[in-house]
Amino acid sequence: MAYARALLKLSGEALMGDQGYGIDPAIVQAIAKDVAGVVASGTQLAIVVGGGNIFRGLKGSAAGMDRATADYVGMLATVMNAITLQDGLERAGIPTRVQTAIEMQEVAEPYIRRRAIRHLEKGRVVVFGAGCGNPFFTTDTTAALRAAEISADVVFKATKVDGVYDKDPHKYADAVRYDTLTFQQVLSGELAVMDSTAIALCKDNNIPIVVFNLFEAGNIGRAVAGEPIGSRISN
């Protein structure tokens, strides 16, 4: 066990698989299987999930919606994903709690930092939904914020690619992957990892970020064990 407490950031797009929209139950099942191994190893795990598989605030804003309104709709989409993820994890035998930044007590606990930490200490997975509760902030920034609040040792960003590249590997065959890089390199190079607010938060709080491919079975466990997969960003 390389990390005692970790925060896993899952994009909404990751949950939809190849469907193009919504949630692929097979993806949820695969994530639950990986997470079960992590919890069994003794690592405390929190998860922040995005909502882009259902609704993305920026796209809504581009289509003419008020930006704040669009972001609130996006936050509600993350709650749908969080509850679905909770169901999948619990069916895999993992005790899980959902906490939301916008209060909706009939379906989830409100976000309370000390309660979240207590859940983690008891071996429960905590899934954070509704972003940070404020428009104009991404779920990547939420991941950095929650990681700092719960004193996580690391942020894992599970994506569709196997690390950070100097350019889009899907478009350019000569794209080069970084094994390690600094927060300053990411910020000055404008590399597509997380938005600058999220990167700056992790930089200021000295929380490393590991970017890896979610769709390779067992990768979440490998990342938690400290195996050299993906790209590691640190000070």
Swiss-Prot record:
GO biological process, one term: 'de novo' CTP biosynthetic process
Pathway: Pyrimidine metabolism; CTP biosynthesis via de novo pathway; UDP from UMP (UMPK route): step 1/1
Highest taxon in the source lineage: Bacteria
Binding residue positions for ATP: 9-12, 52, 56, 159, 165, 168
GO cellular component: cytoplasm
Chain intervals for the UniProt region annotation (Involved in allosteric activation by GTP): 17-22
Entry keyword Secreted: no
Binding site for UMP: 51, 71, 132-139
E.C. number(s) listed in UniProt: 2.7.4.22
CDD domains for this protein: AAK_UMPK-PyrH-Ec
Compartment(s): Cytoplasm
Keywords for the protein's UniProt record, in alphabetical order: Allosteric enzyme, ATP-binding, Cytoplasm, Kinase, Nucleotide-binding, Pyrimidine biosynthesis, Transferase
InterPro entries assigned to the protein according to its UniProt record, in alphabetical order: AceGlu_kinase-like_sf, Asp/Glu/Uridylate_kinase, Uridylate_kinase, Uridylate_kinase_bac
GO molecular function terms listed in the Swiss-Prot or TrEMBL record: ATP binding; UMP kinase activity
The reaction(s) this protein catalyses: UMP + ATP = UDP + ADP
Top EC class, one word: transferase
Pfam families listed in its UniProt record: AA_kinase
Regulation: Allosterically activated by GTP. Inhibited by UTP.
Subunit text: Homohexamer.
Protein name in UniProt: Uridylate kinase
Natural source organism: Synechococcus sp. (strain WH7803)
Upper lineage: Bacteria, Bacillati, Cyanobacteriota, Cyanophyceae, Synechococcales
